[in-house]
């Protein structure tokens, strides 16, 4: 599990949902009949919440006011499993609160309550002391700047310098016109309008996009410059050349918090040793999930996997798979594995499993799961490609990706008629066997294994 330190402006997002069908007799304004209220984590806290949804360990650093909103905010963070030891209380300010009023699923007005004053000397010292204490423990840092007073120029540069000194990845979601504030960061994530404003350059052509990113790289020493382009995806530089990672088409309901989702998913992907292109693809998929929901929504790993793997109808998230299986009464067979470098032994095993029932469901370990189980050099083949290859086999009916170390949650949900494992589990505990009607062990075809294939490639390469 990656450990990420998120620093920035903490915002409470408050939503009033209802319907508006008449005007007030007091003034020509609509009257909202409130049907529902909700309070969400916003700003840097939404970044932290997104990371938690993606199974990261998060330490959050920022300030709230000494008020009811601040107390509720900290309580919500703790409920989400976010470490709040770096959340400081500022008695001189209110907790930043954005109230959105929504009628018939359309936002009609937003009311902001905030104080943007810089932090006082004591709070700055306490904040920096916390960061210095955590910097060696964490894997990466995110600065989420909403221009609410926490991340001024001096503090931002101090944090970036500290992160670089300890060789930590540091990403910044920028605000304002002066990007020297973020110089020497690993990556920044401005949108088109923000970058145009900062550089006084219209990003209306391939040439200008490339020029803008080169300025970020050469003038501000940003190692991985990129710009988010809404429906046009994400553009970045790779070896001096402009690369566009297209967005994933999906109906847009609400873009609130999409930028937070992008920087959270980019950070996690890069920390998992993904290339910048792979990280952008992952971020685009995560953004596609959240813009399809109302409010500061979250994307789960399962939802992102569905978006990334939607090229094959057999690849489903667990919720969708359960809905599909409810419609039939056939005998369900379940097995699971990494299936890294799919080979004849795998295919033979799956054919035998399918012969035991009507529907064969394969639980597939995610990339992160495999790294935890087998080390950082695995998997060889990405989960997207492994899922597609499995789904392409006629004996496999459905593939569901899981991010845990074991498939117990899948088995609990599916309650298969037959649970299948390899014969190497003879006299060993088969996880979830008590939840299936029957457990069967199948012999593997001799002479086939991923490890053997890898060793053969190594020998051939060395020869």
UniProtKB/Swiss-Prot annotation:
Residues 334-463 are annotated as: Cytidylyltransferase. It is an enzyme of class 2 (transferase). Pfam families: CTP_transf_like (PF01467), PfkB (PF00294). Residues 1-315 are annotated as: Ribokinase. GO terms for biological process: ADP-L-glycero-beta-D-manno-heptose biosynthetic process; lipopolysaccharide core region biosynthetic process. ATP binds at residues 191-194. Homodimer. In the N-terminal section; belongs to the carbohydrate kinase PfkB family. This is Bifunctional protein HldE. The lineage of its organism: Bacteria, Pseudomonadati, Campylobacterota, Epsilonproteobacteria, Campylobacterales.
